[in-house]
């Protein structure tokens, strides 16, 4: 038994086997002892060092492998968590889109809202039937998103773009009003007297008044308080003093020109037509330059001591004009012409009711009265009935245009539309507003009277924007009574409501009211009163694809087209200072 013990001692320990890679290549059946490795080795120290290095390398390899596995495990964990969170967020968006909530009350309210909306949803026909249906769905979805996002404490009106209610360009606030600053010496008006009977509506008459003020200064003449011509289109007998404050007008401009209420008695008995002192629009070219007045009008004034301009629509050029005369033009428009208290008080009441409980409101000047529609020579989808009606109106109110259409071949209605020469219809206007992002609950004030097509066309607007109102809806019968049968005075209420609006949208940039209102908002707005000026040619190109274009594409294209009109720039040469007052004559650039 004692002789078998060495065999037990020679049995190798597990840690001395080939795990460390130091076992000699001999019999696989009987492993070497832990001392065998030194047997017959001429350099045992090198062998020990080599084994240690291999053991260290093996440890390092194990640690690297464990680290790599740990890193992969952590990355996998984060990927899993990230996937889970994204899936939850996606589900949350779906819930919000559909108006769903874990709160059963929200689900019930959403269902009730959907049922109510479906009952009210209008069936659209005509050219823009498809687009109006898409707009209705988009506005309804936006309304549900707003309502149920508010239930989750999300921001109100989050779907509206930032620049809807403010000027997108900071440069707009750098321009400040300064037309009230004077350097002119007082004028005695010794060359005679100038009278004017301005035609058109209230806004065209306003432009004529400021232009005649400049002509009076140019000719060193005294100005008689202007008179307004009775128009068979506007059918309003209002005179200057019924709309504007006469005393303020005379006093404010007294350092610039001499203003009197009537001709001296010795001149009142003159037959002005007989002596050649009556000058009509036929005799004065549009946008006549100062030289014309000095050459042709001044000699008559010096001879007869009085000149009477009849019509005087856009009969003074914007350029070239001396600096102080251009500033006088701005001073008249922005400072001297104040509405009478009766108009101001009623307009203030109108604006107060529009704002309600501090809410914003959008003013939309829908220039779509029959005179504009007939004069445009465009077609608006009314078939033969529309064509006969507009032809009849042209014969009565625009006889020269009616005669011209029979004798001369004009561009077709389709060509006029593609060139942006047709006023936007109510349908096109409401599609523009919806595409820009104004939500369904926006309060919209519509300026204008007797929209062509009547209540049927306005119904399209109210179906998409139920909070749409007019002055007739907001003011009581007794409050409107003093202005009935006075279209110019009613237009003055529209002017003030549009000028004070948080946002103003026009449908025809050639409209005098839109031009004057947009200029007023620039002059007094401090860069905080945005105006939407559609480029009708670009908008027409987009609307021509109404049968195929998708709503999201329509939105992008409309927003891009409107964004391009919002650049802040100084008045281009030859353009109206009433519409573009950002010039050194009217405003000062900080």
Curated annotation (Swiss-Prot):
Any one GO BP annotation for this protein: fucose metabolic process
Topology of the protein relative to the lipid bilayer: Single-pass type II membrane protein
Molecular-function GO terms, alphabetical: glycosyltransferase activity
Transmembrane domains' residue ranges: 67-87
Glycan-modified residues: 125, 485, 546
Region (Disordered): 1-26
Chief place where the protein resides: membrane
Domain of life: Eukaryota
Gene Ontology CC: one annotated term: membrane
Entries under Pfam families matching the protein: O-FucT
Locations listed in the record: Membrane
Protein name: O-fucosyltransferase 2
Phylogenetic classification of the source organism: Eukaryota, Viridiplantae, Streptophyta, Embryophyta, Tracheophyta
């Amino acid at each position: 038994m004692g002789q078998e013990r060495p065999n037990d001692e020679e049995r190798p320990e597990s840690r001395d086997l080939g795990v460390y890679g130091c076992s000699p290549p001999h019999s696989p059946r009987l492993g070497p002892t832990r001392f065998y490795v030194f047997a017959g080795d001429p350099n045992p120290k090198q062998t020990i060092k080599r084994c240690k290095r291999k053991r260290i390398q093996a440890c390092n390899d194990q640690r690297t492998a464990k680290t790599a596995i740990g890193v992969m495990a952590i990355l996998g964990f984060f990927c899993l968590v990230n996937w889970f969170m994204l899936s939850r967020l996606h589900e949350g968006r779906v819930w919000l889109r559909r108006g769903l909530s874990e709160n059963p009350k929200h689900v019930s309210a959403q269902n009730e809202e959907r049922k109510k909306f479906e009952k009210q949803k209008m069936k659209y026909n005509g050219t823009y039937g498809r687009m109006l249906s898409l707009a209705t769905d988009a506005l309804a979805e936006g309304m549900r998103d707003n309502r149920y996002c508010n239930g989750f404490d999300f921001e109100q009106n989050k779907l509206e773009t930032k620049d809807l209610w403010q000027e997108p360009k900071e440069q707009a606030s750098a321009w400040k009003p300064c037309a009230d600053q004077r350097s002119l010496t007082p004028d005695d008006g010794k060359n005679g007297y100038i009278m004017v009977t301005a035609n058109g509506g209230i806004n065209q008459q306003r432009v004529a008044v400021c232009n005649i003020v400049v002509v009076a200064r140019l000719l060193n003449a005294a100005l008689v308080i202007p008179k307004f011509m009775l128009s068979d289109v506007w059918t309003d007998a209002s005179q200057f003093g019924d709309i504007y404050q006469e005393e303020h007008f005379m006093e404010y401009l007294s350092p610039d020109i001499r203003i009197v209420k009537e001709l001296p008695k010795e001149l009142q008995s003159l037959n002005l037509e007989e002596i050649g002192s009556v000058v009509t629009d036929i005799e004065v070219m549009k946008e006549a330059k100062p030289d014309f007045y000095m050459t042709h009008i001044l000699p008559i004034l010096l001879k007869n001591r009085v000149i009477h301009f009849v019509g005087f629509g856009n009969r003074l050029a914007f350029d070239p004009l001396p600096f102080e005369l251009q500033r006088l033009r701005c001073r008249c428009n922005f400072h001297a012409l104040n509405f009478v208290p009766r108009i101001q008080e009623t307009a203030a009441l109108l604006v107060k009711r529009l704002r309600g409980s501090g809410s914003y409101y959008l003013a939309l000047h829908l220039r779509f009265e029959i005179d504009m529609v007939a004069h445009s020579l465009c077609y608006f989808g009314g078939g033969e009935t529309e064509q006969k009606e507009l032809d009849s109106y042209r014969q009565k109110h625009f006889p020269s245009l009616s005669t011209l259409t029979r004798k001369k071949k004009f561009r077709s209605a389709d060509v006029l539309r593609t060139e942006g020469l047709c006023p936007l219809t109510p349908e096109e206007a409401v599609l523009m507003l919806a595409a820009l992002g104004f939500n369904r609950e926006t309060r919209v004030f519509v300026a204008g009277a007797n929209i062509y097509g009547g209540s049927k066309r306005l119904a399209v607007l109210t179906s998409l924007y139920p909070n749409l109102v007019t002055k007739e809806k907001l003011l009581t019968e007794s409050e409107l009574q003093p202005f009935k049968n006075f279209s110019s005075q009613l237009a003055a209420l529209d002017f003030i409501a549009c000028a004070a609006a948080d946002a103003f949208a026009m449908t025809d940039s050639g409209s005098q009211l839109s031009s004057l209102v947009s200029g007023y908002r620039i002059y007094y707005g401090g860069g905080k009163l945005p105006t939407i000026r559609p480029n009708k040619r670009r908008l027409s190109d987009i609307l021509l694809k109404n049968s195929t274009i998708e709503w999201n594409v329509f939105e992008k294209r409309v927003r891009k087209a409107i964004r391009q009109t919002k650049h802040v720039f100084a008045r281009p040469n030859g353009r109206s200072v009433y519409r573009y007052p950002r010039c050194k004559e009217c405003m000062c650039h900080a």
